[in-house]
Amino acid sequence: MPLWNVGVNTKTMREKVIEQKLVKAVRSKGGIAPKFVSPGFDGVPDRLVLLPDGKCGFVEVKAPGRKPRPLQMARIKLLRRLGFSVFILDDESRIPHIISEIGGGENAV
């Protein structure tokens, strides 16, 4: 194992890269994607995506091929039942589609 890779969790790093690309893409559409943390209510999606014209959605970011934990899936299902758009993002190529679905328009990113 290379010395530079000692102690590095590549799953976490890959997830972080995807998350950073999502934030950048949302900004390019005039929106924001703050980290969503809810003390006392675990399992909520990672990012709240807020786009112009009052469009919003939630995004759970995972490393490629990873699935949400059972509690995360329960929260995703709850938010969807309440009528919110909720996406699971594990591939950066899906970012334009997600932004478009939330309300960023056909030509998203």
Indicate where each model-derived feature is located:
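Catalytic phosphate/metal-binding cores of nucleic-acid and nucleotide-processing enzymes, i.e., regions
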Residues: M1-V109
